[in-house]
Amino acid sequence: MKFSVLGCGRWGSFISWYLCSKKGYDVCLYGRESSKAFQLLKNTRKNEYVSLDEKILLTSELEKAVDFADIIIISISAQNLREFVRDLVANYHLKDKKIILCMKGLETPSGKRLTQVCIEEGIDKNNIAVWLGPGHIQDFTNGIPNCMTIDSYNK
């Protein structure tokens, strides 16, 4: 199983580190070239919480990240999700991909849940899951037990 994590902030970089370093999966981490977080990871392969294994493919090419994975994890600002998903659906083959949202919040203008936003933009509801907790990256990386869950329409 291959994962792509779209968004290289704290959660995105942590999830990539966890899936590769702790679980042994093949992982691609995508970030925008203009992102400070991406530049830091590109230049040092680390941030304040994790050091990325050399096996993690780090890219600013969205097509490469989408094509790489069986499962796509999106970890971006909730307020940017609609436009981001609209671009994904319009420009990339997502039919056989599972999408996991690892972000919290509601879309501010509409008050809609993030899964609703994805469905409205053309992602099959049976291919969407949410990964939520209470959880803090610094606790996970320091070995402090946390609880997170993944849920979806597709039981």
Language-model features, listed with the residues they occupy:
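Rossmann-like NAD(P)(H) cofactor-binding subdomain of soluble oxidoreductases
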Residues: 52, 62-64, 71-145
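NAD(P)+-binding Rossmann beta1-loop-alpha1 motif at the extreme N-terminus of oxidoreductases
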Residues: 1-60, 68, 87
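Short beta-strand and adjoining strand-loop segment in the mid-core
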Residues: 141-155
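Conserved SAM-binding loop
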Residues: 29, 58, 73-74, 150
